[in-house]
């Protein structure tokens, strides 16, 4: 059984069976067409700044995290247009509790939500992991998160701030038997009264990761405590 990012890598690799050169070309064209488009008017403080999002070539497709949203979390943030969020509690409801725990846990956190990029033409997920309340610093959470995964190297940590939150971010290489060469991945962590939250962006390969990076940056810029 695969766990954590290893499972994500297998998910991404299997998805290539349905991807083609035409798909790659189409989504490249779509990304170019979307560059410069403004976001729709949004409630104050609830959405990313339209000009900022447009400058990054990504539009907001809504906000998750608050009560009543697709995923209820200790934080809230904007997700990119066409990306689809699903609560892992819903996705794993048919699995025995002990199996679900092994399948979705990595280090101090467990997957609570995943945002699928496939509807937007990419192969990968933005996954949100949550943990029990405690006093661990965000960087320590990230170090334990990556320490639970084999194949991680060249970690580069840095602090970041978003609204009322301060946290840590890491860019690193992940090597798997399913890939020909190491690929770039990213994760960030913040501490909340309800426990740590980790946002992780993988991808089929480094090229896919970079193509999805604007969606990750949108989530990071608009991250707020719920």
Positions of PLM-derived features:
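Conserved polar/disulfide-associated segments of primarily extracytoplasmic proteins
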Residues: 72, 88-183, 189-193
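N-terminal targeting sequences that direct proteins away from the cytosol to non-cytosolic compartments
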Residues: 1-103, 204-226
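Calycin-type beta-barrel ligand-binding domains and close structural analogs
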Residues: 150-156, 188-189, 198, 217, ...
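Short, well-ordered beta-strand elements
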Residues: 195-204
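Hydrophobic/basic alpha-helical segments enriched in Actinobacteria
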Residues: 83, 170-174, 178-181, 185-189, ...
């Amino acid at each position: 059984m695969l766990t954590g990012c290893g499972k994500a890598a297998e998910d991404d690799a299997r998805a290539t069976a349905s991807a083609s050169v035409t798909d790659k070309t189409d989504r490249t064209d779509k990304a170019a067409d979307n560059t410069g488009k403004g976001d729709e008017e949004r409630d104050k403080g609830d959405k990313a700044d339209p000009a900022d999002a447009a400058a990054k070539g990504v539009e907001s497709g809504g906000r998750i995290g608050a009560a009543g949203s697709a995923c209820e979390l200790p934080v809230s943030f904007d997700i990119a247009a066409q990306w689809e969020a699903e609560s892992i509690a819903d996705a794993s409801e048919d699995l025995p509790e002990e199996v679900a725990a092994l399948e979705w846990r990595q280090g101090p956190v467990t997957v609570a939500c995943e945002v699928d990029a496939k509807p937007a033409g990419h192969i990968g997920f933005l996954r949100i992991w949550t943990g029990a309340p405690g006093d661990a610093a965000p960087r320590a959470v990230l170090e334990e998160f990556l320490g639970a995964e084999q194949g991680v190297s060249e970690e580069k940590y840095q602090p970041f701030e978003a609204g009322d939150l301060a946290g840590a971010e890491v860019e690193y290489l992940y090597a798997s038997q399913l890939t020909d060469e190491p690929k770039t991945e990213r994760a960030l962590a913040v501490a909340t009264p309800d426990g740590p939250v980790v946002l992780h962006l993988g991808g089929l390969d480094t090229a896919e990761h970079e193509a999805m990076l604007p969606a990750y940056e949108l989530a990071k810029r608009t991250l707020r405590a719920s």
